[in-house]
């Protein structure tokens, strides 16, 4: 049986670094909620069986009317960290008929520049892979190491062979669930899914990402994201 595709959007964070009273995934950019762009990209990929959005149990900002016409489901089961929210979302996917052998693509709600084309490139590249992988970009900037709490450069780090992880991150549902459970048992709270897969001894692949697919994190990122989203993805 051909493995099915599911998308999982952890959306339980508060976005404290964004400088906004409203969680960043609900901020309006180019006329729509930031989260809308992620949901629309996956909605355009009809090959997905379901897109599941994981909210915090006490989220009072989510308004389904802002996402009318898009195909997705919501579960208010988010945890205290990304890792916890993803794990709970993976368990909820079983309700939609997902099996351990099916694929899940986990994507940050705060990466509104994702496109259907990039999603499909990731799937096409990894659909026959035994592990899975992520979209990422080679590090372009010179890297400096600065001690915690300081402002003096300790040394310059080589950027050779370094990649900056993005999302979506695509893995088998069963493999990812067990990898996260193992990390939890060993006291680790990892910041992305590939880290859990690596921790379990597997080797994820990287697929070329896009500068457009950056993560909105700081206050100044909103203006850049709005400028990008106001233009078609294929605009020069």
Swiss-Prot record:
It holds the Pfam family IspD. Belongs to the IspD/TarI cytidylyltransferase family. IspD subfamily. Pathway: Isoprenoid biosynthesis; isopentenyl diphosphate biosynthesis via DXP pathway; isopentenyl diphosphate from 1-deoxy-D-xylulose 5-phosphate: step 2/6. The lineage of its organism: Bacteria, Pseudomonadati, Pseudomonadota, Betaproteobacteria, Burkholderiales. Catalyzes the formation of 4-diphosphocytidyl-2-C-methyl-D-erythritol from CTP and 2-C-methyl-D-erythritol 4-phosphate (MEP). It catalyses: 2-C-methyl-D-erythritol 4-phosphate + CTP + H(+) = 4-CDP-2-C-methyl-D-erythritol + diphosphate. GO terms for molecular function: 2-C-methyl-D-erythritol 4-phosphate cytidylyltransferase activity. One of its GO terms (biological process) is isopentenyl diphosphate biosynthetic process, methylerythritol 4-phosphate pathway. The keyword Nucleotidyltransferase applies. InterPro entries: IspD (IPR001228), IspD/TarI (IPR034683), IspD/TarI_cytidylyltransf_bact (IPR050088), ISPD_synthase_CS (IPR018294), Nucleotide-diphossugar_trans (IPR029044). Keywords: Isoprene biosynthesis, Nucleotidyltransferase, Transferase. The record marks 159, 215 as: Positions MEP for the nucleophilic attack. This is 2-C-methyl-D-erythritol 4-phosphate cytidylyltransferase. It comes from Burkholderia cenocepacia (strain HI2424). It is an enzyme of class 2 (transferase).
